[in-house]
Curated annotation (Swiss-Prot):
Residues 244-257 have a biased composition (Acidic residues). Residues 33-87, 138-290 form a propeptide. Plays a role in controlling food intake and regulating body size. The keyword Nuclease does not apply. The keyword Signal applies. GO terms for molecular function: neuropeptide hormone activity. Belongs to the NPY family. It comes from Drosophila pseudoobscura pseudoobscura. Keywords: Amidation, Cleavage on pair of basic residues, Neuropeptide, Secreted, Signal. This is Short neuropeptide F. Residues 281-290 have a biased composition (Polar residues). Residues 1-32 form the signal peptide. The gene is sNPF.
Length: 290
């Protein structure tokens, strides 16, 4: 009877594996001619060393397409050709560059040609005296659009120039007329300061009777005279004139005392100070001891 030996089975398995590996190694060169290798997006075949070089292959097409495709891509680094030539992508000007890789076709048509002076490669620099401020246009440059405001300004300028020419021709004739315009006209005051009013009578009155009549006709003078008459007709006024001169002076002194300012003692000083005098009645919150 046949007995199963585990060591023999392991040895057979190892022998079979080695045979399979040898068979695979023998068939690998023949299959390499037909197995493409993926490089990027193109399938490039791996040819043996003894195969003659050929630019046209049956699988990947011409190899120049690979470099054309690389040139169309936006790589950060330069593209290196087989002959060690380096080609970089052209940098576009920021003024012509749009967002998201777009180009502006209108910018090429709207580029203004620079003005050059002869053979000197120098841009014209306008001096400050010729530079116009506040957005005004240069009269030497052609106007792009003419508006009604421009016509109005031109009409006003022509009228001003004509008037100046006429004034220049007849300056001697109008000098006498224009001298009086610059003299200041002296007018009578409509009102005086501090509430005073202008007298109603004329200052050219030379006769005293006319002056007296004008004062009498004025209402202010009439009121003053009426008040004086009432004051003289009062009984106290008559009794005062009947007394002696001393009594009259004493009465006048008493009357003037009303207009004198009364000098009072200070009730308190500033900043909490006291007058320094002791009060007449001392008050104490502490009860005296018996």
């Amino acid at each position: 009877m046949f007995r199963f030996n585990p060591q023999l089975s392991h040895g057979c398995a190892l022998a079979l594996i080695c045979c399979l590996l040898n068979l695979l190694m023998m068939h690998q060169p023949t299959n390499a001619e037909l197995s493409p290798v993926v490089q990027g997006e193109f399938f490039l075949p791996i040819l043996p060393d003894d195969h003659p070089p050929n630019t046209d292959t049956s699988f990947g097409g011409p190899i120049s397409n690979l470099y054309d495709n690389l040139l169309q891509r936006e790589y950060a680094g330069p593209v290196v050709f087989p002959n060690h030539q380096v080609e970089r992508k052209a940098q576009r000007s920021p003024s012509l560059r749009l967002r998201f890789g777009r180009s502006d076709p209108d910018m090429l048509n709207n580029i203004v040609e620079k003005r050059w002076f002869g053979d000197v490669n120098q841009k014209p620099i306008r001096s400050p005296s010729l530079r116009l401020r506040f957005g005004r246009r240069d009269p030497t440059l052609p106007q792009m659009r003419r508006t009604a405001y421009d016509d109005l300004l031109e009409r006003e300028l022509t009228l001003n120039n004509q008037q100046q020419q006429q004034l220049g021709d007849t300056a001697d004739d109008l000098s006498a007329d224009y001298d009086g315009l610059y003299e200041r006209v002296v007018r009578k005051p409509q009102r005086l300061r501090w509430g005073r009013s202008v007298p109603q009578f004329e200052a050219t009155i030379g006769d005293n009777d006319q002056l007296y009549n004008s004062l009498w006709n004025s209402e202010k003078m009439r009121r003053m005279l009426l008040a004086l008459q009432q004051y003289e007709a009062a009984p106290g006024h008559v009794a005062g004139y009947a007394n002696d001169g001393d009594d009259t002076e004493a009465q006048l002194d008493e009357d003037t005392s009303e207009f004198q300012r009364e000098a009072r003692k200070p009730m308190r000083l500033r900043w909490g100070r006291s007058t320094g005098k002791a009060p007449q009645i001392e008050t104490s919150s502490i009860a005296p001891k018996n």
